[in-house]
Amino acid sequence: IPVTKLGRLVKDMKIKSLEEIYLFSLPIKESEIIDFFLGASLKDEVLKIMPVQKQTRAGQRTRFKAFVAIGDYNGHVGLGVKCSKEVATAIRGAIILAKLSIVPVRRGYWGNKIGKPHTVPCKVTGRCGSVLVRLIPAPRGTGIVSAPVPKKLLMMAGIDDCYTSARGCTATLGNFAKATFDAISKTYSYLTPDLWKETVFT
Protein backbone atom coordinates (compact mmCIF):
# COMPACT_ATOMS: atom_id res chain seq x y z
CA ILE A 1 0.00 0.00 0.00
CA PRO A 2 1.86 3.07 -1.23
CA VAL A 3 2.07 6.10 1.00
CA THR A 4 3.70 8.72 -1.20
CA LYS A 5 2.37 10.04 -4.51
CA LEU A 6 5.39 8.54 -6.19
CA GLY A 7 4.47 5.16 -4.76
CA ARG A 8 0.96 5.46 -6.18
CA LEU A 9 2.28 6.36 -9.61
CA VAL A 10 4.52 3.30 -9.51
CA LYS A 11 1.65 1.09 -8.40
CA ASP A 12 -0.54 2.31 -11.27
CA MET A 13 2.31 1.57 -13.69
CA LYS A 14 2.52 5.26 -14.63
CA ILE A 15 6.28 5.16 -14.15
CA LYS A 16 8.06 2.68 -16.38
CA SER A 17 11.54 2.70 -14.87
CA LEU A 18 13.65 4.08 -12.07
CA GLU A 19 15.36 6.32 -14.61
CA GLU A 20 12.22 8.45 -14.84
CA ILE A 21 12.34 9.01 -11.10
CA TYR A 22 16.01 10.04 -11.23
CA LEU A 23 15.37 12.30 -14.22
CA PHE A 24 13.14 14.51 -12.08
CA SER A 25 15.30 13.76 -9.03
CA LEU A 26 12.33 12.82 -6.90
CA PRO A 27 13.08 11.58 -3.42
CA ILE A 28 12.29 7.89 -3.03
CA LYS A 29 10.74 7.48 0.39
CA GLU A 30 9.62 3.87 0.13
CA SER A 31 11.87 0.87 -0.32
CA GLU A 32 9.04 -0.99 -2.05
CA ILE A 33 9.50 1.25 -5.08
CA ILE A 34 13.01 -0.12 -5.51
CA ASP A 35 11.79 -3.69 -4.95
CA PHE A 36 9.19 -3.11 -7.63
CA PHE A 37 11.72 -2.11 -10.27
CA LEU A 38 14.83 -4.05 -9.31
CA GLY A 39 13.33 -6.73 -7.10
CA ALA A 40 14.86 -9.81 -8.65
CA SER A 41 18.30 -8.51 -9.48
CA LEU A 42 19.07 -6.80 -6.17
CA LYS A 43 21.85 -8.23 -4.06
CA ASP A 44 22.84 -6.96 -0.65
CA GLU A 45 26.10 -7.35 1.18
CA VAL A 46 26.80 -6.52 4.80
CA LEU A 47 30.00 -4.51 4.78
CA LYS A 48 30.45 -4.33 8.52
CA ILE A 49 28.68 -4.68 11.81
CA MET A 50 30.25 -2.74 14.59
CA PRO A 51 29.24 -2.29 18.20
CA VAL A 52 28.88 1.31 19.32
CA GLN A 53 28.60 2.23 22.95
CA LYS A 54 26.97 5.02 24.86
CA GLN A 55 28.15 5.66 28.39
CA THR A 56 25.30 5.75 30.91
CA ARG A 57 25.55 5.96 34.65
CA ALA A 58 24.80 2.26 34.84
CA GLY A 59 27.64 1.31 32.52
CA GLN A 60 27.63 1.03 28.76
CA ARG A 61 24.71 0.89 26.42
CA THR A 62 25.78 -1.22 23.43
CA ARG A 63 24.07 -0.96 20.10
CA PHE A 64 25.01 -2.39 16.75
CA LYS A 65 25.67 -0.36 13.68
CA ALA A 66 25.33 -2.13 10.35
CA PHE A 67 26.67 -0.96 7.01
CA VAL A 68 24.93 -2.54 4.05
CA ALA A 69 25.61 -2.11 0.37
CA ILE A 70 22.96 -3.00 -2.14
CA GLY A 71 23.08 -3.11 -5.92
CA ASP A 72 21.87 -4.89 -9.02
CA TYR A 73 25.32 -5.21 -10.65
CA ASN A 74 23.95 -3.12 -13.47
CA GLY A 75 24.08 0.59 -12.81
CA HIS A 76 22.25 0.97 -9.51
CA VAL A 77 23.85 0.99 -6.10
CA GLY A 78 22.88 2.09 -2.62
CA LEU A 79 24.43 2.31 0.82
CA GLY A 80 22.60 2.11 4.12
CA VAL A 81 23.71 2.55 7.71
CA LYS A 82 21.52 1.67 10.64
CA CYS A 83 22.01 1.51 14.37
CA SER A 84 19.91 -0.79 16.50
CA LYS A 85 19.93 -2.83 19.70
CA GLU A 86 20.02 -6.15 17.88
CA VAL A 87 22.17 -7.12 14.95
CA ALA A 88 19.29 -8.48 12.88
CA THR A 89 17.15 -5.36 13.13
CA ALA A 90 20.15 -3.19 12.36
CA ILE A 91 20.85 -5.15 9.19
CA ARG A 92 17.22 -5.14 8.17
CA GLY A 93 16.96 -1.39 8.68
CA ALA A 94 20.22 -0.80 6.86
CA ILE A 95 18.96 -2.77 3.86
CA ILE A 96 15.82 -0.64 3.72
CA LEU A 97 17.86 2.55 3.99
CA ALA A 98 20.23 1.28 1.33
CA LYS A 99 17.28 0.75 -1.00
CA LEU A 100 16.07 4.28 -0.39
CA SER A 101 19.50 5.68 -1.15
CA ILE A 102 19.94 3.84 -4.45
CA VAL A 103 21.50 6.03 -7.13
CA PRO A 104 22.06 5.45 -10.83
CA VAL A 105 25.66 4.96 -11.90
CA ARG A 106 26.87 6.51 -15.09
CA ARG A 107 29.25 4.26 -16.90
CA GLY A 108 31.58 5.16 -19.72
CA TYR A 109 34.59 4.04 -21.69
CA TRP A 110 38.34 4.23 -21.46
CA GLY A 111 39.42 5.23 -24.93
CA ASN A 112 37.47 3.65 -27.77
CA LYS A 113 33.76 3.22 -27.43
CA ILE A 114 33.33 -0.45 -28.24
CA GLY A 115 30.75 -2.72 -26.67
CA LYS A 116 29.10 -1.99 -23.35
CA PRO A 117 30.33 0.86 -21.14
CA HIS A 118 32.45 -0.72 -18.46
CA THR A 119 34.21 1.90 -16.34
CA VAL A 120 33.58 5.33 -14.82
CA PRO A 121 33.08 8.09 -17.41
CA CYS A 122 35.69 10.41 -15.93
CA LYS A 123 37.81 10.79 -12.83
CA VAL A 124 35.51 11.41 -9.90
CA THR A 125 36.21 11.97 -6.25
CA GLY A 126 33.99 11.53 -3.26
CA ARG A 127 34.70 12.32 0.31
CA CYS A 128 33.28 11.78 3.75
CA GLY A 129 35.10 12.89 6.87
CA SER A 130 38.82 12.75 6.16
CA VAL A 131 38.43 9.98 3.63
CA LEU A 132 38.78 10.90 -0.01
CA VAL A 133 38.14 8.29 -2.69
CA ARG A 134 39.09 8.89 -6.29
CA LEU A 135 37.77 6.71 -9.09
CA ILE A 136 39.82 6.68 -12.27
CA PRO A 137 38.72 5.09 -15.56
CA ALA A 138 40.62 1.95 -16.52
CA PRO A 139 40.98 0.01 -19.77
CA ARG A 140 38.77 -3.01 -20.31
CA GLY A 141 39.91 -6.18 -18.59
CA THR A 142 41.65 -4.39 -15.73
CA GLY A 143 39.08 -5.33 -13.13
CA ILE A 144 38.51 -3.18 -10.07
CA VAL A 145 41.81 -2.11 -8.59
CA SER A 146 40.76 -1.13 -5.13
CA ALA A 147 40.51 -1.89 -1.45
CA PRO A 148 37.94 -4.53 -0.44
CA VAL A 149 35.32 -2.00 0.71
CA PRO A 150 35.00 0.15 -2.41
CA LYS A 151 35.48 -2.96 -4.52
CA LYS A 152 32.19 -4.40 -3.27
CA LEU A 153 30.39 -1.15 -3.92
CA LEU A 154 31.85 -0.77 -7.39
CA MET A 155 31.03 -4.36 -8.29
CA MET A 156 27.45 -3.80 -7.20
CA ALA A 157 27.34 -0.67 -9.30
CA GLY A 158 28.22 -2.77 -12.32
CA ILE A 159 31.54 -1.06 -12.96
CA ASP A 160 33.91 -3.67 -14.36
CA ASP A 161 37.15 -1.75 -14.64
CA CYS A 162 38.31 1.03 -12.38
CA TYR A 163 41.43 2.29 -10.68
CA THR A 164 40.92 3.82 -7.26
CA SER A 165 43.04 5.79 -4.87
CA ALA A 166 42.08 6.59 -1.31
CA ARG A 167 43.40 9.23 1.06
CA GLY A 168 42.76 9.78 4.73
CA CYS A 169 41.74 7.44 7.48
CA THR A 170 40.31 4.65 5.38
CA ALA A 171 40.19 2.41 8.43
CA THR A 172 36.93 4.14 9.35
CA LEU A 173 34.92 1.79 7.24
CA GLY A 174 31.76 3.85 7.39
CA ASN A 175 33.41 6.91 5.95
CA PHE A 176 35.36 4.84 3.45
CA ALA A 177 32.15 3.32 2.15
CA LYS A 178 30.33 6.65 2.17
CA ALA A 179 33.14 8.37 0.29
CA THR A 180 33.07 5.66 -2.37
CA PHE A 181 29.31 5.93 -2.60
CA ASP A 182 29.64 9.70 -2.87
CA ALA A 183 32.07 9.31 -5.76
CA ILE A 184 29.82 6.80 -7.53
CA SER A 185 26.81 9.06 -7.19
CA LYS A 186 28.77 12.00 -8.60
CA THR A 187 29.19 10.22 -11.93
CA TYR A 188 25.90 11.72 -13.09
CA SER A 189 26.54 15.22 -11.77
CA TYR A 190 29.54 15.68 -14.05
CA LEU A 191 29.01 17.51 -17.30
CA THR A 192 31.23 15.63 -19.73
CA PRO A 193 32.08 16.86 -23.24
CA ASP A 194 29.69 14.40 -24.87
CA LEU A 195 26.83 16.10 -23.05
CA TRP A 196 27.82 19.61 -24.13
CA LYS A 197 25.18 21.68 -25.83
CA GLU A 198 25.87 22.46 -29.45
CA THR A 199 27.11 26.04 -29.48
CA VAL A 200 25.12 28.01 -32.00
CA PHE A 201 27.28 30.80 -33.40
CA THR A 202 25.23 33.90 -34.01
Curated annotation (Swiss-Prot):
What organism, scientifically named, is this protein from?
Cricetulus griseus
What terms describe the molecular function in GO for this protein? Answer: RNA binding; structural constituent of ribosome
Please give the function described in this protein's UniProt entry: Component of the ribosome, a large ribonucleoprotein complex responsible for the synthesis of proteins in the cell. The small ribosomal subunit (SSU) binds messenger RNAs (mRNAs) and translates the encoded message by selecting cognate aminoacyl-transfer RNA (tRNA) molecules. The large subunit (LSU) contains the ribosomal catalytic site termed the peptidyl transferase center (PTC), which catalyzes the formation of peptide bonds, thereby polymerizing the amino acids delivered by tRNAs into a polypeptide chain.
Which family, according to UniProt? Belongs to the universal ribosomal protein uS5 family.
The record describes its quaternary structure and partners as: Component of the small ribosomal subunit. Interacts with zinc finger protein ZNF277 (via zinc-finger domains); the interaction is direct; the interaction is extra-ribosomal. Interaction with ZNF277 competes with the binding of RPS2 to protein arginine methyltransferase PRMT3.
GO biological processes: translation
PTM sites of type Phosphothreonine:
T192
Lineage of the source organism?
Eukaryota, Metazoa, Chordata, Craniata, Vertebrata
Q: Output a single Gene Ontology CC term carried by this record.
A: cytosolic small ribosomal subunit
Pfam family name, one: Ribosomal_S5
Record flagged with keyword Transcription: no
PTM note says: Citrullinated by PADI4 in the Arg/Gly-rich region. Asymmetric arginine dimethylation by PRMT3 occurs at multiple sites in the Arg/Gly-rich region.
Protein name in the entry: Small ribosomal subunit protein uS5
Entry-linked InterPro entries: Ribosomal_Su5_D2-typ_SF (IPR020568), Ribosomal_uS5 (IPR000851), Ribosomal_uS5_C (IPR005324), Ribosomal_uS5_euk/arc (IPR005711), Ribosomal_uS5_N (IPR013810), Ribosomal_uS5_N_CS (IPR018192), Ribsml_uS5_D2-typ_fold_subgr (IPR014721)
Under the heading NCBIfam families, the entry gives:
uS5_euk_arch
Per UniProt, the keywords (alphabetical) are: Cytoplasm, Nucleus, Phosphoprotein, Ribonucleoprotein, Ribosomal protein, Ubl conjugation
Provide the S5 DRBM domain boundaries. Answer: 42-105
- Location(s), subcellular: Cytoplasm; Nucleus, Nucleolus
Q: Keyword check for RNA-binding, yes or no.
A: no
Gene3D superfamilies in alphabetical order: 3.30.160.20, 3.30.230.10
Where is this chain primarily localised?
A: cytoplasm
